[in-house]
Amino acid sequence: RRSGLKVECRVKGFADFGAVEWVLNFKNLSDANSATIEQVKVVDLNLTSPGEGGFTVHYADGSHVSKADFHQRTKVLAPGDSLYMAPEGGRSSQNAFPFFNIEAPDGRGAMVAVGWSGTWFADVAAGTKGGVALSAGQKNLSAYLYPSEAIRTPSVCLLFWQGENRFAGHNAFRRFILAHHTRKIDGKPARYPVSTSFNYGDPAPCNEYTCLTTDYAIALIRRYEQFDIVPEVFWLDAGWYEQAADYKNQKNWANTVGNWKVDRERFPDGLKPVADEVHRVGAKFMVWFEPERVVKGSQWAVEHPEWMVDVGADQYLFDLGNPEAREWMCDYIGDFIEQSGIDYYRQDFNMEPAWFWAKNDEPGRAGIREIRHIEGLYAFWDYLLE
């Protein structure tokens, strides 16, 4: 009996680096809800080696918001040992890192990358007779699909290497990313620019986030010009929007996101005059945004409550999984960037989305909210690059 469920694996190989990457897509072609899709392992394979000794996994912690962020870790897998990795809170590098190196005892190995800006998992388990089993995918998925509904999984990339030590793999993977997954400008990999902020420090509350004005920003730009130290980019950080400067009423940059209108008391003509001055001295202009998090009572929350994913907290998650909401966000931020003369878009995300997804999943459809949000996030970024 046919289930009506179509499973497609899109694969791309890179012969110049001995690498391969793929992603799975599921689509329900039937007229009824599909059976439950769960325990999906986008990669599920065994790695073996003729060498003596155990396999070693080189990995990193991810971010703990500490000085030890992305600390390097190494685990030698004895027979029966395993290493399970997964981020916390719904952000892909929170307490775990989706890139790691499996080193065999014979001078070979595989670099592994899991492409998913949500909650992924990866497991490396050593067998009792040698070799290791590798599996990875979306951590929380147990859902049926509606008729004609389709979803994608995380992607996986494997790069096989051979050399004296693990650094052969690290360096090969770095070159691979530069060659095939780095944005090109005039045929060359885009470089991170040397940038500076408009922050002039404390005493709080008068710092960039509350007291910066058009006049002060322009004066600061001219000061850099005077001393011939103009950077490649001037970076305007958080707090340029309405209510962020109202510290007398306990407002600040963090509890006013969702008010994506320029504070006209500090920037009476918007951000364009600042951008014009930045461009006059030969630099580019970068501006900070955090569109996924929306504080209750803010502009976006009031104007579009139907697009707010709610868990009863003091903030919402913007519903990027809603095509209408995503299209509106694309137009709003895209128009703002063009009208304000912004060259570089900087995106932040200061919340854990996992519980917003989980609490708003329909019964029997765990993981769908996460998938739709990540798909929408990628579509939004694609729009900005067009």
Language-model features and meaning:
Residues 154, 191-196, 232-236, 285-289, ...:
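Hydrophobic faces of well-ordered beta-strands that scaffold small-molecule active sites
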Residues 1-130, 139-141:
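Polysaccharide-binding surfaces and accessory modules of carbohydrate-active proteins
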Residues 218-233, 238-284, 291-293, 298-303, ...:
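Catalytic cores of extracellular degradative/oxidative enzymes
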Residues 263-281, 297-386:
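Active-site neighborhood of glycoside hydrolase catalytic domains
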